[in-house]
Amino acid sequence: DVYKRQHQYNPIEYIKSRIKAPESIVKKLKRYGYDSSIDNMVNYINDIAGIRIVCSFTSDIYRLAEMIGKQNDLTVISVKDYIRHPKESGYKSYHMLVTVPIFLSDCIIDTKVEIQIRTMAMDFWASLEHKIYYKFEGNAPGYISRDLRECSDIVSMLDAKMLSLNEAILEAKAAQEAALLREEKDRADKEK
């Protein structure tokens, strides 16, 4: 709502949230070389809770990240900008690791939450990439990896084109509104 009042539109298309399943936590700890324990989970697993914010344009990603960073009810621990620095696979998204206070009856526990912010096109690519790699258990053939990176480049071009188109639409709308105001002023001046 605050963003909508400031910018005349809501950049958020949708939000997804999830809590990592216990068996996924155990697998991840083993992959990292740690025993399954509460202490290891708290110390080494940063994405037990996750929120994905999917927005329209790449410019929205950075505006939303800035707004999230200014929230006084959470603390930003780290940021990974996979948009400016994509993963080798072609994955692009903006990740923020934050701590959020959880109020219990007798104490407050700061809990890590991973926030991912991406465009609809990035989300589409990431969803399909995840399914493909899951089928190959992380060992996709080289040609599939190359094709995925190529598709990631196409997604980037699409995002850039849509952002450019949106900016052109906003400029045309502003010019149209300015012309209407001039016409109204000219009419009012003639009537005097």
Give the location of each predicted region.
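Long beta-strand-rich cores associated with HINT superfamily self-processing modules
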Residues: V42, C55-S164
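Short aromatic/hydrophobic contact patches that present stacked aromatics
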Residues: G50-V54
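A structural signal for alpha-helix termini and helix-coil/disorder junctions
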Residues: R31, D35, K70, L74, ...
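A glycine-rich, hydrophobic loop/mini-helix early in the fold
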Residues: Q8-A49
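Short, charged low-complexity intrinsically disordered segments located at boundaries
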Residues: R18-K28, C55-D60, Y94-P101, L181-E191
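Intrinsically disordered, low-complexity acidic/polar and Pro/Ser/Thr-rich regulatory regions
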Residues: S164-K192
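Short, small-residue-biased leader/transition segments that mark boundaries at the very start
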Residues: V2-Y3
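Residue-level detector of functional hotspots within protein domains
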Residues: P11, I15, S37-D39, K80-R84, ...
